[in-house]
Amino acid sequence: MQLVGGALLLITLVTAILAKDVKRNLSWISFCSASIISCVAYDLLFFVGQQTGPSPDRGLCLVQSALVHAVPVMQAGVNLALIAHTWTSVRAAVYQKNRVSRCNLFILFVAFPYILTIALFLGFLVFAIQHPQTVERDNMGVYCKIVFDGVPSKITAGISAVLMLVSVIFEVIVARMLIRHWKLLCHSGMPRSFVIRVLVFSAVGGLVLVLTMVYVVSDGGGTGADFIMASLPLISSLVFGTQEDLIRAWMFWRPPRPMAVKPIRARNDSEGTLE
C-alpha cells in the first residue's frame, strides 16, 4: 500500500513539475517530496530483498533505523508548512492583504522540516552506530528500527504530535474562515474543489495527530496504527493527485481548454494554495 501511494505521488509530482498548465507552490511540492522520501525510507529492505531470511545488511539496517524515526517528523513538518501556506492564501483572499512574510517566513516553513529531520536522523544514526544491539528488524520484517525502551519512538511521536497540533489549530482557523466567508471566497476566484480538499486534508491531519499520540502512550501503536500510517501516502495521492488540471495533463490527446481569466484580486493574493 505504501509503495502504491509513493508511486502515485511520484507520478503526480513529476506531472506537476513538467506540465506547463499545472502550477503548484513550493509547499505543495515539498509535501509530495517528503511523502515519497518517507515511502522509500520504510521500504529500503524491500528494495534490496532483505525483508525475510537472514539478518539484513548491518549498514543498511542502521541507516534505515535512523530514517524511520526521523521521517515522521518531516511529514508532520511539511504538513504544517502546507496548511500554514493555505492559511496565508485564504487570509489574503478574505482580507485583501498580501500573504504574511511572503518570502522569509515561507522559506522558513519549507526549510525547517528538513533541517529538523536531518538533525534527528544524524542523532539517531550516531546512537544506532554506538549501540548496534538496539537495532533490529521489526516483527513483520518490514523495516529496521531502534529498540531502546521505546525512547526513539516517543521522541519522534512527541515532536510530530506538537507539529500536528499546530497544524490542526491552523486547520480549524482555515475552516472557520471558509465557513464565514464562503461567498466572498467563491467570488474571489478560489475554486470550490479547493475547499473540499482542505477539509479532507484537515481530516487526514487530525488522524495523524491521533496516531502520533497513540505511539507516545503505547510505544508503537500496534499493527492497526502501522496499517493506517502506511495508507497515508495513498490517501495523499488521492487527495492531491485527482485535481482537474493534473487529470487534463494526463489526457494529452484532448485539446487544451481555454484559460479562464481570474479576478485581479484572486490573481494577486490567493494564487498557489492547494490547487
Model regions: which residues?
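Membrane-proximal first intracellular loop
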Residues: 1-113, 117, 260
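Interhelical loop segments of eukaryotic multi-pass membrane proteins
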Residues: 26-29, 51-58, 91-97, 129-146, ...
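Helix-to-loop junction signature of class
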Residues: 37-52, 117-138, 203-226
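Membrane-water interface of transmembrane alpha-helices
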Residues: 78-88, 169-183
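Extracellular-loop-to-transmembrane junctions of the mid-late helices
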Residues: 116-177
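Intracellular effector-coupling site of seven-transmembrane GPCRs
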Residues: 173-216, 232, 236-239
